[in-house]
């Protein structure tokens, strides 16, 4: 058995001009139909924008979907609801880090584990300074009011790690004066316990959100236990009509166990800090232009401590470095006609060791009759080599260059029946070069990290939702991914179909997820196909008490996502929600 204890501390402080005012949403004169509020997003524009004006696709998972999923982690919810997105798992709860870990997030075949996908909380990047990957166990459901997923490169606005896309967790807040407290608790299979307590306050210009959680499980295998506790706090104050000041802290501590030999532990203390300034303005009718400046410093110190053998009690440095990134960008949106919006952006990004990268993007959004939308875009994504690739372990190479790719995309969507029926289709092609991979050293013996990889992915994504009546609704999504060079944890086919029922005191939802062509190994090739059936139900006893239950993998499918780590068969959880 091997256990890792990982504390994660994320701090944020921001001062916003214009954020305290009532949002001024963009409107179109083409149609008088009312569009849903979840079409207003902040990801992909740095300000509140009607998603119809953007030439890129942003998927939104709202608070209602998050709560009905009854999951302590956001990532399984995103796997169901967002086409093209997949998250690896190894057990009933928890992801861990390092050897045997899961929580790898991939979007269209590009993975956050290789720093090609960015996760943000309220627009602040969240990734390890040395290893460059997101910390999957830090993204818990109690944080989110909604999650916005930009499917495709977002490097113009967000820089290096947004090469494949962005997941932005928008945190909760009170809209009106008052106090709201919510307790969620449940117990189930394999001695699994999940708890969460959230308090939200708004009084005049002051607002706060304070949350805490404790989760643990014995796991479905010997030495697969997991324990996690953490908290989140956010304080805000409206200084003036157009000025908001807020600060937040997110602390997560988890103990992750997994089978394996005892080896010398790897310890590290990494950091990531920075400043992001931007100003969004309108100069004339139909115009919006954003100027921005970013500075980030990341790095850290990692070392091995020997616990046995002739070197017992000593340590050896692996890396002690830091790097800086400095960037400026401009993002332009212009309504050319009532039926056409033009988008363009350019970023100039300088890395203290690697050099300067120019990052353009361009797109068109056509607003057609019958609430149809057609979007076309071409955007560049890039990422700098991370410290691990340049300086750690025998394959390291300090002369690595940035990876880069182009994403070409065509998207069509429509709302029918006064918005009760919505559907969309995306076609995309990704062409990338200089991908970092470990290959035989051309100038000597052994292996070396090199810019020798290529990526050529193409696919189609479909999603639809239909509100049948005030009691019934159905939704689904499908994605097909063709990879010239297959990678692990990016399924060829991913399908989800779900339905929900709400009447009186009852809320019931169920869904089927089909995964096919999931590579768990590439040499030799091993793929997995499986079908998962989940069922969730909530009964409202009174205004302050709900009783809930959920079952996962009710077909008791035998499958693996991480090679060598079989997933649990059918599991059941039940619990209560208190609202006061």
What kind of region is each of these model predictions?
Residues 7, 20, 236-239, 376, ...:
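Conserved C-terminal beta-signal and adjacent last beta-strands/turns
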Residues 335-338, 429-431, 450-518, 546, ...:
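Gram-negative outer-membrane beta-barrel transporters
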Residues 22-67, 75:
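Short, acidic, small-residue-rich periplasmic hinge/interaction motif at the N-terminus
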Residues 217-230, 238-272:
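Flexible loop and strand-edge segments within Gram-negative outer membrane beta-barrel domains
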Residues 124-151:
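Short acidic/polar hinge/loop motifs at secondary-structure boundaries
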Residues 154, 166, 170-201, 212, ...:
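Short strand-turn segments of transmembrane beta-barrel domains in outer membranes
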Residues 205-206, 297-304, 367, 373-375, ...:
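Membrane-embedded beta-barrel scaffold of Gram-negative outer-membrane proteins
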Residues 76-124:
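Extracytoplasmic beta-strand/coil segments of soluble accessory domains associated
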């Amino acid at each position: 058995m091997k256990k890792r204890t990982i504390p994660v501390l994320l701090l944020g402080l921001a001062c916003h001009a214009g954020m305290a005012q009532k949002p001024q949403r963009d409107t179109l004169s083409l149609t008088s139909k009312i569009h849903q509020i979840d079409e207003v997003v902040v990801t992909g524009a740095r300000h509140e924008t009607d998603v119809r004006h953007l030439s890129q696709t942003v998927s939104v998972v709202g608070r209602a979907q998050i709560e009905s999923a009854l999951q302590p982690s956001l990532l399984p919810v995103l796997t169901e609801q967002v086409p093209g997105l997949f998250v690896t798992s190894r057990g009933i709860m928890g992801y861990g880090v390092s050897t045997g870990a899961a929580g790898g997030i991939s979007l269209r075949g590009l993975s956050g584990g290789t720093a090609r996908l960015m996760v943000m909380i309220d627009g602040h990047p969240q990734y390890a300074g040395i290893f460059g990957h997101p910390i999957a166990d830090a993204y818990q459901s109690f944080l989110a009011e909604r999650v916005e997923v930009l499917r495709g490169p977002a490097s113009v606005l967000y820089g290096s790690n947004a090469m494949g896309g962005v997941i932005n967790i928008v945190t909760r807040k009170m809209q009106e004066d008052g106090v709201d407290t919510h307790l969620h608790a449940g117990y189930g299979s394999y001695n699994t316990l999940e708890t969460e307590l959230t308090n939200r306050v708004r009084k005049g210009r002051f607002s706060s959100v304070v949350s805490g959680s404790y989760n643990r499980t014995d796991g479905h295998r010997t030495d697969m236990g997991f324990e996690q506790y953490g908290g989140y706090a956010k304080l805000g104050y409206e200084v003036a009509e157009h000025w908001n000041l807020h600060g937040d802290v997110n602390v997560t501590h988890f103990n992750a166990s997994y089978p394996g030999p005892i080896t010398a532990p790897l310890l590290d203390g990494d950091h990531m800090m920075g400043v992001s300034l931007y100003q969004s303005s309108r100069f004339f009718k139909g115009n919006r232009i954003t100027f921005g400046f970013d500075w980030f410093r990341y790095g850290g110190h990692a070392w091995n401590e020997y616990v046995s053998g002739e070197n017992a009690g000593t340590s050896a440095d692996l890396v002690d470095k830091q790097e800086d990134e400095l960037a400026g960008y401009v993002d332009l949106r212009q309504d050319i006609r009532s039926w056409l919006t033009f988008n363009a952006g350019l970023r100039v990004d300088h890395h203290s060791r690697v050099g300067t990268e120019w990052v353009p993007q361009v797109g068109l959004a056509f607003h057609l009759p019958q609430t149809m939308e057609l979007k076309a875009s071409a955007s560049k994504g890039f990422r700098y080599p991370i410290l691990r690739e340049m300086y750690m372990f025998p394959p390291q190479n300090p002369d690595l260059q940035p990876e880069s790719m182009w994403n070409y995309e065509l998207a069509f969507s429509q709302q029918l029946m006064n918005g009760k029926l919505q559907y969309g289709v995306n076609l995309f092609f990704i062409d990338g070069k200089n991908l970092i991979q470990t290959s035989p050293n051309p100038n000597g013996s052994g292996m070396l990290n090199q810019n020798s990889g290529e990526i050529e992915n193409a696919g189609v994504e479909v999603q639809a939702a239909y509100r049948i009546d005030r009691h019934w609704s159905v939704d689904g999504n499908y994605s097909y991914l063709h990879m010239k060079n297959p990678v692990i944890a990016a399924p060829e086919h991913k399908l989800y179909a779900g339905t929900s029922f709400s009447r009186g005191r009852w809320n019931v939802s169920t869904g089927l997820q089909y995964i096919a062509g999931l590579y768990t190994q590439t040499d030799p090739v091993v793929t997995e196909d499986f079908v998962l059936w989940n069922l969730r139900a909530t009964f409202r006893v009174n205004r302050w008490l709900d009783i809930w239950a959920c079952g996962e993998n009710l077909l008791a499918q035998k499958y693996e996502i991480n090679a060598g780590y079989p997933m649990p068969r059918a599991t059941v959880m039940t619990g209560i929600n208190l609202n006061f």
